Amino acid sequence: MSKTIATENAPAAIGPYVQGVDLGNMIITSGQIPVNPKTGEVPADVAAQARQSLDNVKAIVEAAGLKVGDIVKTTVFVKDLNDFATVNATYEAFFTEHNATFPARSCVEVARLPKDVKIEIEAIAVRR
């Protein structure tokens, strides 16, 4: 049985979906765009957008009682694969800052994202 994960520390869903689901041993987040949950603002550059998206994922994972180190898989959606190196640097710094092992990851270029942001990130975390 799944439980809905909801937190004010990540942006509210902008469609008919939830921020995340808790399956007991596994947490699955919805894709997180770089919206600051307090201000509703979106940073301009892709590095700041990547960081905000990761912070939003972290907030959902933590709302389920887990931590960044429990994330085992992410999917990164970018509007421009030329941003790959910048996103990688931000991503590496984020997981290093949280003393977390890098999770498995997919990264794909997409034509468009909600609110015309440059990046969206979703994650799977597990209870150990």
From Swiss-Prot:
One of its GO terms (cellular component) is protein-containing complex. It is an enzyme of class 3 (hydrolase). InterPro entries: RidA, RidA_CS, RutC-like_sf, YjgF/YER057c/UK114. GO terms for biological process: isoleucine biosynthetic process; protein homotrimerization; response to toxic substance. Transmembrane segments: none annotated. Substrate binds at residue 105. The record marks 120 as: Important for catalytic activity at high pH. One of its GO terms (molecular function) is deaminase activity. It holds the Pfam family Ribonuc_L-PSP. Its main location: cytoplasm. It is found in: Cytoplasm. It catalyses: 2-iminobutanoate + H2O = 2-oxobutanoate + NH4(+); 2-iminopropanoate + H2O = pyruvate + NH4(+). Pathway: Amino-acid biosynthesis; L-isoleucine biosynthesis; 2-oxobutanoate from L-threonine. The record marks 17 as: Stabilizes the substrate. Keywords: Amino-acid biosynthesis, Branched-chain amino acid biosynthesis, Cytoplasm, Detoxification, Hydrolase, Isoleucine biosynthesis. It comes from the Bacteria. SUPFAM superfamilies: YjgF-like. The keyword Hydrolase applies. Its EC number is 3.5.99.10. Accelerates the release of ammonia from reactive enamine/imine intermediates of the PLP-dependent threonine dehydratase (IlvA) in the low water environment of the cell. It catalyzes the deamination of enamine/imine intermediates to yield 2-ketobutyrate and ammonia. It is required for the detoxification of reactive intermediates of IlvA due to their highly nucleophilic abilities. Involved in the isoleucine biosynthesis. Belongs to the RutC family. Homotrimer. This is 2-iminobutanoate/2-iminopropanoate deaminase. It comes from Escherichia coli (strain K12). The gene is ridA.
